[in-house]
């Protein structure tokens, strides 16, 4: 069930679902697994807010275990495409594809709550049963290209070398907020809401 917020206006009361009300304040919630329909919703909100006023920041709250690489990269590409700065605020966790999205916020405007976690690892893929050897080779090559793409983005976002990101993402690598800050994925740990 989605909560409803009631506001007093000059014409009486107006009710909003909570997400529509947050959108009025340029807040987008990116929660749950990253998949196509969620990505489409986030992208539509980014485009809407940018068209509404590209001089004002957009606030993207992130709490995700990750998910689809293509859906996540569509969000990242849109964040980079629009003119408005996207501030990212990690709450709970940003894992896997979530780290790529959260670290792609505007430099100097990437935040994390004190008890949130980050996790990087190499992308996963599979070919399913009954797959021909040639298709398996194609899938393996694609997975290597995908890993390179993601590690390049993470290296650019953190200021770390590709080699370090590659080594650190070999297995699940969980980071506290402090470790994430030291790595360079975020710019500040927020104990209270001081966003501009």
UniProtKB/Swiss-Prot annotation:
Domain of life: Bacteria
Reaction equations catalysed: Hydrolysis of proteins to small peptides in the presence of ATP and magnesium. alpha-casein is the usual test substrate. In the absence of ATP, only oligopeptides shorter than five residues are hydrolyzed (such as succinyl-Leu-Tyr-|-NHMec, and Leu-Tyr-Leu-|-Tyr-Trp, in which cleavage of the -Tyr-|-Leu- and -Tyr-|-Trp bonds also occurs)
SUPFAM superfamilies given in the database record: ClpP/crotonase (SSF52096)
Hydrolase among keywords: yes
GO cellular component entries: cytoplasm; endopeptidase Clp complex
Localization terms from the record: Cytoplasm
Family matches, as Gene3D superfamilies: 2-enoyl-CoA Hydratase, Chain A, domain 1 (3.90.226.10)
EC number: 3.4.21.92
Statement: the UniProt record of this protein carries the keyword Protease: yes
InterPro entries, sorted: ClpP, ClpP/crotonase-like_dom_sf, ClpP/TepA, ClpP_His_AS, ClpP_Ser_AS
Entry annotation: catalytic residues: 96 (nucleophile), 121
GO molecular function ontology, one term from the record: ATPase binding
GO BP terms, alphabetized: protein quality control for misfolded or incompletely synthesized proteins
EC primary class: hydrolase
Entry keyword set: Cytoplasm, Hydrolase, Protease, Serine protease
HAMAP family registered for this protein in UniProt: ClpP
Subunit architecture: Fourteen ClpP subunits assemble into 2 heptameric rings which stack back to back to give a disk-like structure with a central cavity, resembling the structure of eukaryotic proteasomes.
Function comment: Cleaves peptides in various proteins in a process that requires ATP hydrolysis. Has a chymotrypsin-like activity. Plays a major role in the degradation of misfolded proteins.
Family from the record: Belongs to the peptidase S14 family.
Name of the molecule in the record: ATP-dependent Clp protease proteolytic subunit
Species annotation: Streptococcus pneumoniae (strain 70585)
Protein's gene: clpP
């Amino acid at each position: 069930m989605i909560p409803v917020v009631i506001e007093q206006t000059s014409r009486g009361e107006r009710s909003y679902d909570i997400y529509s009300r947050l959108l009025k304040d340029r807040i987008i919630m990116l929660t749950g697994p990253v998949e196509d329909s969620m990505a489409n919703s986030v992208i539509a909100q980014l485009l809407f807010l940018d068209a509404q006023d590209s001089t004002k920041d957009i606030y993207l709250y992130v709490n995700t275990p990750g998910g689809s690489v293509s859906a996540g990269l569509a969000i990242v590409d849109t964040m980079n495409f629009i003119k408005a700065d996207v501030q990212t605020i990690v709450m709970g966790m940003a894992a896997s594809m979530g780290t790529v999205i959260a670290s792609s916020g505007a430099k100097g405007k990437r935040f994390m709550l004190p008890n949130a976690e980050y996790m990087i690892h190499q992308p996963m893929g599979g070919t399913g049963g009954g797959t021909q050897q040639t298709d398996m080779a194609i899938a393996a090559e694609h997975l290597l290209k995908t890993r390179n793409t993601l590690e390049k983005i993470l290296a650019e976002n953190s200021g770390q070398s590709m080699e370090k990101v590659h080594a650190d993402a070999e297995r699940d690598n969980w980071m506290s907020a402090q470790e994430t800050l030291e790595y360079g994925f975020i710019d500040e740990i927020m104990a209270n809401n001081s966003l501009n």
